[in-house]
UniProtKB/Swiss-Prot annotation:
Zn(2+) 1 binds at residues 1358, 1361, 1382, 1385. Binds phospholipid vesicles containing phosphatidylinositol 3-phosphate and participates in endosomal trafficking. Residues 491-500 have a biased composition (Low complexity). This is Early endosome antigen 1. Homodimer. Binds STX6. Binds RAB5A, RAB5B, RAB5C and RAB22A that have been activated by GTP-binding. Interacts with ERBB2. Interacts with RAB31. Interacts with SAMD9 and SAMD9L. May interact with PLEKHF2. SMART domains: FYVE. It comes from Mus musculus. It is found in: Cytoplasm; Early endosome membrane. Residues 78-1348 form a coiled coil. The modification Phosphoserine is found at residues 52, 70.
C-alpha cells in the first residue's frame, strides 16, 4: 500500500489515458476502496460491498433492474455530481491526483452500466445518482483521512531510515578517523623502532668497550664471593619464575573465562541479528530499545562523570586539609620553640632558686646567734619560702596554660628575684651580727664548711651532667638502630614497589597487545568495506550487462552465446576469488608474524628502559633520604653546641658569683670586728627574744615539712600529667611527621626526574636558608631584649611594693639603715648584671658573625677539595685509559690467536672439545683477572687513605700494571703451548676435517649471534652505569658529610670530658685553697693569674685541635670519596652481571607474567579496599581516644586549680595565725636566753635533715630520669610502628590509584570493543543484504531467461490475484515478463529495456524495475 501511494504522481493520469485499453483505468479506485474501511466491489446505489465483479453484476440485475426510465434526469444528475466534484477539488488541493483518479473511475463505471443494463426510468436514475454521489463523497473523505495517516506513517518511517543512515555515516567517519589515528600511531611506532635500533647500535659499541674493561684480571678471593652472589641471584630468579608461572596460570584461567563469555555474547549477537533480519517491523522496536540503551548508557556516563567530579572535589579537600595540617604543624613547631626557650628561662630561674636555697641554709646556721632582727628576718624568710612554693606551682601551671598566663608568671618571677635580694640583704645583716658575737676562727671554719658543701653540690651537678650525657649517647645509639631498621623497611618497600611496577608494565603490555588486535580488526573492517564497494561496483556492472542482455534478447540475438559468456565469466571470477583469498591469507599471516616480532622487540626494549628508570628513581629517593638525615643530624649538633655553650656560661657565672661572695665576706669580716663591741650590749636583749622564737621556729618547721610533703605529692601528680601531655604531643608530632613524609614521598616521586637539574639551585636555597636562620636568631635576640624590658618593668613594680612595705615597716628602717645602703649596692649590681647580659648578647652576635665567616671559609675549602678531587679523578682516568689500551692490545692478540684456533679446530671433534675446555679455562682465568683487578682496586683504596703518599700509590699501580703485562705474556706462552698441542692433534686427526667443518661453521654463527646479543645488553649496561655513577657520587658525598658531622660530635664530646676533668681538678684545688684562705690570701692573686693563663692556653689548644680536626675531616672526606668510587665500580660490575642474567630470564617469563599480574592486581585491589576500611576504623577509634584523653586532662587541670585555691586559703589562714602567735610571743622573749644552746643543737639536726631530704630528692630525680628513658623508648617504638602503618597506607593508596586507572583504561577498551563489535555487526548485516540481493538478482536473471509471451487461450485467471477473466474483467499482458494479469494487478507503467516509452507492467515487475 505504501509503495502505491509513494508511486502516485499527478502526471500519471495522462499516461494512463494514452494506453490502448480503456478498461484498465478503474483499477485505482478499486484499490482505494479495497484499502479503506470496506472490502471488495461496492454497489453504486445501495453501497453494499461484494467480493468480486461477477457478484456485483448479479446483485445489480436482481435488485436494481426495476425499469428503464428516461436518461435526461441522469444527465442532469451527472452534471450535479460534476459540480460537486469540482467543489471538492477546490477544498482538497493537496490530493488532486487521487481525486482525478476517483472521478475518472466513476465515469468508467457509469459507461459499463449503461452498456449492460440499458436505460432506466429518469426518476429512479436521478434518485440513485444522488445517493451514489453522497456515498462517493463519504468514501472519498474516508480515503483522504486514511491517505493522510498513511503519509504520516511513511514520514516517520522515512525519518527513522534517515536517522539510521546518519548514524551509519557518523560511524563510518569515526572508523576512518580511527584508521587515520592508528596509521599515525603506527608511523610513530616505526620511528620509535628506528630510534631504538639506533640506540641499540650505540649500546653495542658501548658494550664492546665494556668488554675490553671486563677482560682485566680479577683476584682469586672475589671469585668465591661472585659465585655466592650468583647462587643467590639464581635462587631469587627461580622463585620469581615460579611466582610468574603461577600468575600466568591464573591469567590463563581468566582468559578462558573471558573467551567463554565472549562466545556467549557472540551467540547473543547472532540471535539479535537473526531477529533483526526477520522483518522491518521489528526494526523500529529494536531501534527504540537501542535508543533506550543509549539513554541508559548516557545516564551511566553522567553518573560516572558526577562521581569523578566528586572524587576530584574530595581530592581537592584532602589537599586543602593537608595544607592546613602543615600550617598547624608549623605553628606548633614555633610554639614548641618558644616553650623550649621559656623552659630554659625556667631552668635558669630554678638554678637561681637553688642558689637561694643554699643561702637560706647558711642563714639557718647563723640564726641561733642573732637577736630581735633575726626574728623578723626569719618570718620574712618563711614568707619568701611559701611564696616561692606558690611560684613553683604557678610556673608549672604556666607550662600547661602556655600562652594565657605567661605575663603573670614573669611578674611572679620578678617578685621572687626581689625577695631573693631582700634575703641577701638579711644574710649580710646576720653575718654582721654573727661576726660581732663570735670569733674569727669560728667564722672561717663555718665558711670553709659552706664552701665544701658548695663543692659537693657542684660535684653532684657534674655527675648529673655526666649521666645526662650518657643518656644522650644511649639515645643516639637507639636512634641509629631505629634508622637502620627504617632503612631495611624502606628497602623492602622499594622491592615491593619495583615488583608492583613490573606487574603494571606487564599489564600495559597486555593492553598494547589488545589495542594491536583491535587495530587488526579495524583493518579487517576497512578491507570488508573495500570489498563491499567492489561488490557494489560489480553489481552495477552486472546490472549494465543485464540491460545489454535484455536488449539483445529483445532484439532477437543469440541467447545461448550470451549464457555461455556469462557462465565463463562467472567461472573465471570464482577462480580469481579463490586465488585472491589464498594470497590474502598468506600475506595476512606473514604480516601478523612480522608485526608480532616487532612488537616483542619493542616490548623487550621498553622493559629494559623501564627497569633502568626504576633503578634511577630508587637511587634518587635514597639520596634524598640521606640528605634529610644529614640535615637532621646537623640540627642536632647545633642544638648540642648551644646547650654546651649555655652550660659553660652558667659555670662561669657561678664561679664569678663565688668570687664576689668571697670579696663580700672579707669586707664583712673587717666591719664585723669593729661592730662586735657595739653589739655585745644588744646581745643580751636578743638572747631573750631568741628563746621565744626557737619554739615558734620549731612549730613552723614542722608545718613547713608537712607542706613540703604535700608539695611533693602535687609535683608527682603534675609530672604524671606532664608525661601524658608529652606523650600526646609526641603522638601528634609523629602523625605530623608521617604526613610530612607522605608529602615528601609524593614530591620526591614527582620531582625525581628534576633533582639533577635542581642541584645548583639547591645550593642557592641553602644560602638563603642560612640567611633566614640568621634573621630568626636576630629575632630571638630582639625577643630577649623585650624580656629584659619586661623584667625591668617588673623591677619597677617590685620597687613600688617595696615602698609600701617600707611605709609599714618604719621601725625596721630605723634599725636597718645599713641594710638599705646594701640594697642600693645590690640594685647597682643588678644594673651591672643587666649590662653584662647586653654584652653577652653582643658577644653572641659576634659569635654568629664568626660562625658565618667559618661557613664561608669551609665552603671555600670544600671548593678547593672538590677541585683537587677532580684533578685526582682526571689522573686516575688517564691511568685507566693507559691500562685499557694495554688490555686492548692483549685482546687483539687473543682474537688473532682465537681465529687461528678456530681455523685449526675445524679438523676434528675432539679438538673442538679441547678448545671448549680451553675456553672454559680462559673464562676462569678472566675471572681470576677480575679478582686480581678487585685486589688492585683494594690496594688503590688503601693507598689513598693517606693523601701524602699519592706518589707511592701511583708507583704501586704502575707495578701492578707491569704484573698484568707479565701475566699477559705468560698467557701468550700458554696459548703458544696450546697451539703446539693443536698442531699435534691436527697431524693425528686429518681424517675428520670434512665432517667437522660444517659443525664449526654453525658454532661460529651461533657465537656471532651471541656476541650481538651481548653487545646489545652491554650497551644498556653502560647507560645504566653512567646514571648510577652520577647518583652514587652524590650519595657518597652526602655520606662523607655525615661522617664529618659525627666526628665533630665525637670531638665535642671529648672536649666536654676534658673540660669536666679540668673543672673537677680546679674544684679540688679550690677546696684545698679554702682550708688555707687566711694564710694564702697573698698567693690568691697569683693563682688566679695562673688560672687565667691556663684558660687562655686551653682556648688556644682547643682552637688548634679544631683546626687539626677540620684538616682531618677534609682528608677523610677525600679518602671516602675515592673509596666510594672504587666500590661503585665493583658494585656496578656485579649489578650488570646480575642484570644480564635477569634480562635473559625476564624475556622468557614476560608473556606469562602479564596474565598473572591482572589477577593479582584485582585481588590486591580487594585486599587494599578491605584494609583501607579497617584502617579508617582504627583512625576513628584513635581520634575518639584522643578526645577522651583531652577531656580527662581538662578535668585534671580543673581539679589542680581547685586544690591550689584551697591551699592558698589555708595558707592565708595560717599566716593570720602566725601573726597572732608572733604578737603573743613578743612578750616572752626574755625566756629565750635559756634555750640558746638547745636551739643551736636543733639547727644542726635540721641541717642534717635537709641534707637527707636533698639526697632523697636527688634519688627521686634519678628515678624520674629512668622513667623518662623508658617513655622515650616506648615513643620510639610507637613512632616506628606508626611510620610502618603510614607507609603501608601510602602504598595501598598508590596501588588503589593505579587499579582505578587500570579499570578506567579497561572500561575505555571495553567501550571501544563494543563499538567495534557494533560496526562488525553492521558490516556483516550489509554483507548478508548484499548476498540476498545477489540471490534475488540471480533468481530474477533465471526468471528473465525463462520468460515467454503467454497466450490468451491458455490463461483463464489472473496470474497474481487469481481472478477469473470475463467481460468486465479483461486480460492485460505485462510487457516485461509476458504474463497475463487483470487490470488491478497491471495498473502501472514503467520503462523497460525493450521499449523507449513507459509500458503497462505488473506490480512485481514494476517494483523490480523501480527498485
Amino acid at each position: 500500500m505504501f509503495r502505491r501511494i509513494l508511486q502516485r504522481t499527478p502526471g500519471r493520469v495522462g499516461s494512463q489515458g494514452s494506453d490502448l485499453d480503456s478498461s484498465a483505468t478503474p483499477i485505482n479506485t478499486v484499490d482505494v476502496n479495497n484499502e479503506s474501511s470496506s472490502e471488495g466491489f461496492i454497489c453504486p446505489q445501495c453501497m453494499k460491498s461484494l467480493g468480486s465483479a461477477d457478484e456485483l453484476f448479479k446483485h445489480y440485475q436482481a435488485v436494481h433492474d426495476a425499469g428503464n426510465d428516461s436518461g435526461h434526469g441522469g444527465e442532469a444528475g451527472l452534471a450535479l455530481t460534476r459540480d460537486d466534484i469540482t467543489l471538492l477539488r477546490q477544498e482538497v488541493q493537496d490530493l488532486q491526483a487521487s481525486l482525478k483518479e476517483e472521478k475518472w473511475y466513476s465515469e468508467e463505471l457509469k459507461k459499463e452500466l449503461e452498456k449492460y443494463q440499458g436505460l432506466q426510468q429518469q426518476e429512479a436514475k436521478s434518485d440513485g445518482l444522488v445517493t451514489d454521489s453522497s456515498a462517493e463523497l463519504q468514501a472519498l473523505e474516508q480515503q483522504l483521512e486514511e491517505a493522510q495517516t498513511e503519509n504520516f506513517n511513511i514520514k516517520q518511517m522515512k525519518d527513522l531510515f534517515e536517522q539510521k543512515a546518519a548514524q551509519l555515516a557518523t560511524e563510518i567517519a569515526d572508523i576512518k578517523s580511527k584508521y587515520d589515528e592508528e596509521k599515525s600511531l603506527r608511523a610513530a611506532a616505526e620511528q620509535k623502532v628506528t630510534h631504538l635500533t639506533e640506540d641499540l647500535n650505540k649500546q653495542t659499541t658501548v658494550i664492546q668497550d665494556l668488554k675490553t674493561e671486563l677482560l682485566q684480571r680479577p683476584g682469586i678471593e672475589d671469585v668465591a664471593v661472585l659465585k655466592k652472589e650468583l647462587v643467590q641471584v639464581q635462587t631469587l630468579m627461580d622463585n620469581m619464575t615460579l611466582e610468574r608461572e603461577r600468575e600466568s596460570e591464573k591469567l590463563k584461567d581468566e582468559c578462558k573465562k573471558l573467551q567463554s563469555e565472549h562466545a556467549h555474547l557472540e551467540a547473543t549477537i547472532n540471535q539479535l541479528r537473526s531477529e533483526l533480519a526477520k522483518g522491518p517491523q521489528e526494526v523500529a522496536v529494536y531501534v527504540q530499545e537501542i535508543q533506550k540503551l543509549k539513554g541508559s548508557i548516557n545516564e551511566l556516563t553522567q553518573k560516572n562523570q558526577n562521581l569523578t567530579e566528586k572524587l576530584q572535589k574530595k581530592d581537592l579537600d584532602y589537599t586543602h586539609l593537608e595544607e592546613k595540617h602543615n600550617e598547624e604543624s608549623a605553628s606548633r613547631k614555633t610554639l614548641q620553640a618558644s616553650l623550649h626557650q621559656r623552659d630554659l628561662d625556667c631552668q635558669q630561674l630554678q638554678a637561681r632558686l637553688t642558689a637561694s636555697e643554699s643561702s637560706l641554709q647558711r642563714a639557718q646556721g647563723e640564726l641561733s646567734e642573732k637577736a630581735e632582727a633575726a626574728q623578723k628576718l626569719r618570718e620574712e624568710l618563711r614568707e619568701v619560702e611559701s611564696t616561692r612554693q606558690h611560684l613553683k606551682v604557678e610556673v608549672k601551671q604556666l607550662q600547661q596554660q602556655r600562652e594565657e598566663k605567661e605575663q603573670h608568671g614573669l611578674q611572679l618571677q620578678g617578685e621572687v628575684s626581689q625577695l631573693h635580694c631582700k634575703l641577701l640583704e638579711t644574710e649580710r645583716q646576720l653575718g654582721e651580727a654573727h661576726g660581732r658575737l663570735k670569733e674569727q676562727r669560728q667564722l672561717s671554719s663555718e665558711k670553709l664548711m659552706e664552701k665544701e658543701q658548695q663543692v659537693a653540690d657542684l660535684q653532684l651537678k657534674l655527675s648529673r651532667l655526666e649521666e645526662q650525657l650518657k643518656e644522650k649517647v644511649t639515645n643516639s645509639t637507639e636512634l641509629q638502630h631505629q634508622l637502620e631498621k627504617s632503612k631495611q623497611q624502606h628497602q623492602e618497600q622499594q622491592a615491593l614497589q619495583q615488583s608492583a611496577t613490573a606487574k603494571l608494565r606487564e599489564a600495559q603490555n597486555d593492553l598494547e597487545q589488545v589495542l594491536r588486535q583491535i587495530g587488526d580488526k579495524d583493518q579487517k573492517i576497512q578491507n570488508l568495506e573495500a570489498l563491499l564497494q567492489k561488490g557494489k561496483e560489480s553489481v552495477s556492472l552486472l546490472e549494465k550487462e543485464r540491460e545489454d542482455l535484455y536488449a539483445k534478447i529483445q532484439a532477437g540475438e543469440g541467447e545461448t552465446a550470451v549464457l555461455n559468456q556469462l557462465q565463463e565469466k562467472n567461472h573465471a571470477l570464482q577462480q580469481q576469488l579463490t586465488q585472491l583469498t589464498e594470497k590474502l591469507k598468506n600475506q595476512s599471516e606473514s604480516h601478523k608474524q612480522a608485526e608480532e616480532n616487532l612488537h616483542d622487540q619493542v616490548q623487550e626494549q621498553k622493559a629494559h628502559l623501564r627497569a633502568a628508570q626504576d633503578r634511577v628513581l630508587s637511587l634518587e629517593t635514597s639520596v634524598s633520604e640521606l640528605s634529610s638525615q644529614l640535615n637532621e643530624s646537623k640540627e642536632k649538633v647545633s642544638q648540642l653546641d648551644i646547650q654546651i655553650k649555655a652550660k659553660t656560661e652558667l659555670l662561669l657565672s657561678a664561679e664569678a658569683a663565688k668570687a664576689a661572695q668571697r670579696a663580700d665576706l672579707q669586707n664583712h669580716l673587717d666591719t664585723a670586728q669593729h661592730a662586735l663591741q657595739d653589739k655585745q650590749q644588744e646581745l643580751n636583749k636578743v638572747s631573750v627574744q631568741l628563746d621565744q622564737l626557737t619554739a615558734k621556729f620549731q612549730e613552723k618547721q614542722e608545718h613547713c615539712i608537712q607542706l613540703e610533703s604535700h608539695l611533693k605529692d602535687h609535683k608527682e601528680k603534675h609530672l604524671s600529667l606532664e608525661q601524658k601531655v608529652e606523650d600526646l604531643e609526641g603522638h601528634i608530632k609523629k602523625l605530623e611527621a608521617d604526613a610530612l613524609e607522605v608529602k615528601a614521598s609524593k614530591e620526591q616521586a614527582l620531582q625525581s626526574l628534576q633533582q639533577q637539574r635542581q642541584l645548583s639551585t639547591d645550593l642557592e636555597l641553602r644560602n638563603a636558608e642560612l640567611s633566614r636562620e640568621l634573621q630568626e636568631q636576630e629575632e630571638v635576640v630582639s625577643c630577649t631584649k623585650l624580656d629584659l624590658q619586661n623584667k625591668s618593668e617588673i623591677l619597677e613594680n617590685i620597687k613600688q611594693t617595696l615602698t609600701k612595705k617600707e611605709e609599714e615597716n618604719v621601725v625596721l628602717k630605723q634599725e636597718f639603715e645599713k641594710l638599705s645602703q646594701d640594697s642600693k649596692t645590690q640594685h647597682k649590681e643588678l644594673g651591672d648584671r643587666m649590662q653584662a647580659a647586653v654584652t653577652e648578647l653582643t658577644a653572641v652576635k659576634a659569635q654568629k658573625d664568626a660562625l658565618l665567616a667559618e661557613l664561608s671559609t669551609t665552603k671555600e675549602k670544600l671548593s678547593k677539595v672538590s677541585d683537587s678531587l677532580k684533578n685526582s679523578k682526571s689522573e686516575f682516568e688517564k691511568e685507566n685509559q693507559k691500562g685499557k689500551a694495554a688490555v686492548l692490545d692483549l685482546e687483539k692478540a687473543c682474537k688473532e690467536l682465537k681465529h687461528q684456533l678456530q681455523v685449526q679446530a675445524e679438523s676434528a671433534l675432539k679438538e673442538q672439545e679441547d678448545l671448549k675446555k680451553s675456553l672454559e679455562k680462559e673464562k676462569e682465568t678472566s675471572q681470576q683477572l677480575k679478582i686480581e683487578l678487585n685486589s688492585v682496586k683494594g690496594e688503590v683504596s688503601q693507598a689513598q687513605n693517606t693523601l701524602k703518599q699519592k706518589e707511592k700509590d701511583e708507583q704501586q699501580l704502575q707495578g701492578t700494571i707491569n704484573q698484568l703485562k707479565q701475566s699477559a705474556e705468560q698467557k701468550k706462552k700458554q696459548i703458544e703451548a696450546l697451539q703446539g698441542e693443536v698442531k699435534n692433534a691436527v697431524s693425528q686427526k686429518t681424517v675428520l676435517e670434512n665432517k667437522l667443518q660444517q659443525q664449526s661453521s654453525q658454532a661460529a654463527q651461533e657465537l656471532a649471534a651471541e656476541k650481538g646479543k651481548l653487545s646489545a645488553l652491554q650497551s644498556n649496561y653502560e647507560k645504566c652505569q653512567a646514571d648510577l655513577k652520577q647518583l652514587q657520587s652524590d650519595l657518597y658525598g652526602k655520606e662523607s658529610e655525615l661522617l664529618a658531622t659525627r666526628q665533630d660530635l665525637k670531638s665535642v664530646e671529648e672536649k666536654l670530658t676534658l673540660a669536666q676533668e679540668d673543672l673537677i681538678s680546679n674544684r679540688n684545688q679550690i677546696g684545698n685553697q679554702n682550708k688555707s684562705i687566711q694564710e694564702l690570701q697573698a698567693a690568691k692573686a697569683s693563682l688566679e693569674q695562673d688560672s687565667a693563663k691556663k684558660e687562655a692556653l686551653l682556648k688556644e689548644q682547643s682552637k688548634a685541635l679544631e683546626d687539626a680536626q677540620r684538616e682531618k675531616s677534609v682528608k677523610e672526606k677525600e679518602l671516602v670519596a675515592e673509596k666510594s668510587k672504587l666500590a661503585e665500580m665493583e658494585e656496578i660490575k656485579c649489578r650488570q652481571e646480575k642484570e644480564i642474567t635477569k634480562l635473559n630470564e625476564e624475556l622468557k617469563s614476560h608473556k606469562q607474567e602479564s596474565i598473572k599480574e591482572i589477577t593479582n592486581l584485582k585481588d590486591a585491589k580487594q585486599l587494599l579496599i578491605q584494609q583501607k576500611l579497617e584502617l579508617q576504623g582504627r583512625v576513628d577509634s584513635l581520634k575518639a581516644a584522643l578526645e577522651q584523653e583531652k577531656e580527662s586532662q581538662q578535668l585534671m587541670r580543673e581539679q589542680v586549680k581547685k586544690e591550689e585555691e584551697k591551699r592558698k586559703e589555708e595558707f592565708s589562714e595560717k599566716e593570720a595565725k602566725l601573726h597572732s602567735e608572733i604578737k603573743e610571743k613578743e612578750a616572752g622573749m626574755k625566756k629565750h636566753e635559756e634555750n640558746e644552746a638547745k636551739l643551736t643543737m636543733q639547727v644542726t639536726t635540721l641541717n642534717e635533715n635537709l641534707g637527707t631530704v636533698k639526697k632523697e630528692w636527688q634519688s627521686s630525680q634519678r628515678r624520674v630520669s629512668e622513667l623518662e628513658k623508658q617513655t622515650d623508648d616506648l615513643r620510639g617504638e610507637i613512632a616506628v610502628l606508626e611510620a610502618t602503618v603510614q607507609n603501608n597506607q601510602d602504598e595501598r593508596r598508590a596501588l588503589l590509584e593505579r587499579c582505578l586507572k587500570g579499570e578506567g583504561e579497561i572500561e575505555k577498551l571495553q567501550t571501544k570493543a563494543l563499538e567495534l563489535q557494533r560496526k562488525l555487526d553492521n558490516t556483516t548485516a550489509a554483507v548478508q543484504e548484499l548476498g540476498r540481493e545477489n540471490q534475488s538478482l540471480q533468481i530474477k536473471h533465471t526468471q528473465a531467461l525463462n520468460r515467454k509471451w503467454a497466450e490468451d487461450n491458455e490463461v483463464q485467471n489472473c496470474m497474481s490475484c487469481g481472478k477469473c477473466f470475463s467481460v468486465t474483467v479483461r486480460r492485460h499482458h505485462c510487457r516485461q515478463c509476458g504474463n497475463i494479469f487483470c487490470a488491478e494487478c497491471s495498473t502501472k507503467n514503467a520503462l523497460t529495456p525493450s521499449s523507449k516509452k513507459p509500458v503497462r507492467v505488473c506490480d512485481a515487475c514494476f517494483n523490480d524495475l523501480q527498485g
